[in-house]
């Protein structure tokens, strides 16, 4: 049975905002937008976070060390963010960054274009259209550093977790903590859920959402949303997301550009 789950999240107002668009497609016809109704598409409402001046301590930003050059394997494709085709919030909150992904992954043509909600989205699939692993890059409005954002990360994570809970059957937030992506300090939460009634049965869903503050005192941070399903044979739990399978390439190669 065909199934589609769409999550559209936008956080704005006050100090912080974020936008992501993720499509988990257990199976979706490529030439039509019509899908069978079970499970029906789910779109979240738009939450808003209002941060008071006391929520964010204006601390001096500590600039992380310059990351070493990434040695890309022969089958890797580089994505370099560009402002050329962006409009709206993505143009307003543009960030220079790059990463590599395997050439067998599919680049989503709906990201990084006018009207898009993500700078980039790439996906590993089983034919014809079953998600195994997914990597999407969005943005959030930052106070300028990990130190300055630290006090509001738990609030932002709680708001996003509440939205995921409404959208994913069997949703559970598993953990929440500070993290690192290479030399960059960040904050993340991990979660589990299900994608039900697909033609391959009920699929386990595991996810990580990482906030990466800007490195040079800018106001635009990056969000990395990673999702995986039990169709990825190397993954057995949420702890494997970004550690096993093919997502590690994206985390290891992610680099901020000039801010």
PLM region descriptions:
Residues 120-155, 222-227:
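A short acidic-to-branched-hydrophobic micro-motif
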């Amino acid at each position: 049975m065909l199934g589609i789950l769409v999550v559209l999240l936008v956080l704005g107002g006050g100090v912080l905002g974020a936008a992501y668009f993720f499509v988990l497609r257990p199976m979706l016809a490529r030439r039509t937008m019509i899908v069978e109704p079970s499970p029906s598409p789910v779109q979240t409402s738009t939450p808003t976070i209002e941060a008071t001046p006391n929520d964010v301590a204006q601390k001096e930003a500590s600039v992380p060390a310059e990351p070493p050059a990434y040695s890309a394997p022969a089958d890797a494709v580089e994505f370099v963010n560009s402002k050329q085709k962006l409009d709206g919030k993505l143009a307003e909150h543009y960030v220079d960054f790059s990463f590599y992904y395997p050439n067998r992954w599919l680049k989503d043509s709906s990201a990084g274009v006018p009207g898009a909600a993500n700078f980039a989205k790439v996906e590993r699939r089983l034919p014809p259209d079953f998600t195994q692993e997914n990597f999407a890059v969005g943005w959030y409005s930052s106070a300028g550093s990990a130190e300055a954002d630290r006090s509001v990360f738990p609030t932002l994570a709680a708001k996003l977790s509440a939205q995921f809970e409404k959208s994913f059957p069997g949703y559970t937030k598993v953990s929440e903590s500070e993290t690192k992506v290479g030399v960059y300090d960040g904050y993340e939460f991990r979660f589990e859920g299900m994608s039900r009634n697909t033609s391959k049965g009920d699929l386990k869903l595991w996810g990580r959402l990482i906030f990466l503050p800007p490195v040079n005192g800018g106001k635009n941070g990056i969000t990395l949303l990673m999702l995986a399903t039990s169709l990825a044979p190397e993954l057995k739990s949420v702890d494997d997301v970004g550690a096993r399978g093919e997502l590690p390439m994206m985390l290891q190669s992610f680099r901020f550009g000039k801010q």
